Amino acid sequence: MNRLQHIRGHIVSADKHINMSATLLSPLSTHVLNIAQGVPGANMTIVLHRLDPVSSAWNILTTGITNDDGRCPGLITKENFIAGVYKMRFETGKYWDALGETCFYPYVEIVFTITNTSQHYHVPLLLSRFSYSTYRGS
C-alpha cells in the first residue's frame, strides 16, 4: 500500500464515521438494499413528508440521496420529529434507470405512524426491479 492509499483509507473511514454519527443523531433512519444484485441502493432520492392533521396535506420535510452504503444520514432532527403520520418516498424508477434497468414500481411510498418520539425508528427498503419489502427496524 502506498502512502496516498494509506491516507485515503483514513479519510474514507472518517467520512463513514461522520455519516454514521449523523444517522445515529437522527431519530429516523433508512437503509436501501438492492437485493437483486446484493448491493446497497446508492444514489437514490428519498423525500420525507409529514401529514398535516388539519388539512390532510402532505408537507415535504426534507429530501436526501442515499450514500454509497444505501443510507441517508440526518433525515430529520430531533426538534422536528413530532408525533404524526410520515411518508418516505423512494424514487426507485430513477434509481433503476441510472443502472440501465427497467422496473415495475416507478417509486415506493412507505407510510408509517410515529407515536413515541423518544424512540429511534429505522425504516429499511429491500428492493428488486419487480418487488419490494419493508419493516420497522430499531
Swiss-Prot record:
Annotated pathway: Purine metabolism; urate degradation; (S)-allantoin from urate: step 2/3
Domain of life the protein comes from: Eukaryota
Matches recorded under CDD domains: Transthyretin_like (cd05469)
Keyword Hydrolase assigned: yes
Catalytic activity field: 5-hydroxyisourate + H2O = 5-hydroxy-2-oxo-4-ureido-2,5-dihydro-1H-imidazole-5-carboxylate + H(+)
Binding locations of substrate: 31, 71, 135
InterPro entries, per database record: Hydroxyisourate_hydrolase, Thyroxine_BS, Transthyretin/HIU_hydrolase, Transthyretin/HIU_hydrolase_d, Transthyretin/HIU_hydrolase_sf
Subcellular location: Peroxisome
A GO biological process held by the record: purine nucleobase metabolic process
Single GO cellular component term: peroxisome
Enzyme Commission identifier(s): 3.5.2.17
Keyword entries, A-Z: Hydrolase, Peroxisome, Purine metabolism
Similarity comment text for this entry: Belongs to the transthyretin family. 5-hydroxyisourate hydrolase subfamily.
PANTHER family: 5-HYDROXYISOURATE HYDROLASE (PTHR10395:SF11), URICASE AND TRANSTHYRETIN-RELATED (PTHR10395)
Quaternary context: Homotetramer.
Function field: Catalyzes the hydrolysis of 5-hydroxyisourate (HIU) to 2-oxo-4-hydroxy-4-carboxy-5-ureidoimidazoline (OHCU).
Misc: HIU hydrolysis also occurs spontaneously, but more slowly.
Name of the protein: 5-hydroxyisourate hydrolase
UniProt organism field: Danio rerio (Zebrafish)
Gene from which the chain derives: urah
